[in-house]
């Protein structure tokens, strides 16, 4: 059994917006309200970022066309006592999916926690102290 940090990506559609900033604000408020209704205040909500295929620069994942906005949102949560990476992903999607019922959720990133910290191998200092 392991503990994981799971980051899910969600596309949020908002209507009647005039600008990207307004779309972002409405999308974040919509997600936070839905999570609070289900008492999921432990889920961190962040604006998603996309990468330009030409220059590689990062920009906010928010677009407005015809007063309709599409905003990419990252949802981060810790999953405890999962049997595997796939199990942690399913748990995270089930938990967040309760609040965001008709929003497709995609795994963006997942990391295993070791002793409450993100894992990823041993550092030089830890190896040297031996």
From Swiss-Prot:
InterPro entries noted in UniProt: UPF0212
Similarity field: Belongs to the UPF0212 family.
The protein, known as: UPF0212 protein PF1486
């Amino acid at each position: 059994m392991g503990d994981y940090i799971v980051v899910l990506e969600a596309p949020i559609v908002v209507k009647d917006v005039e600008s990207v900033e307004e779309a972002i604000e409405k999308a974040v408020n919509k997600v936070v309200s839905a999570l609070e209704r289900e008492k999921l205040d432990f889920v961190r909500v962040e604006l998603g970022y996309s990468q330009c295929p030409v220059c590689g620069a990062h920009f906010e994942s928010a677009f407005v066309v015809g007063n309709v906005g599409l905003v990419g949102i990252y949802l981060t949560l810790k999953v405890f006592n999962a049997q595997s990476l796939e199990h942690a992903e399913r748990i995270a999607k089930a938990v967040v999916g309760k609040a965001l019922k008709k929003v497709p959720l995609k795994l963006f990133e997942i990391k295993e926690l070791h002793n409450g910290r993100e894992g990823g191998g041993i550092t030089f200092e830890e190896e040297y102290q031996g």
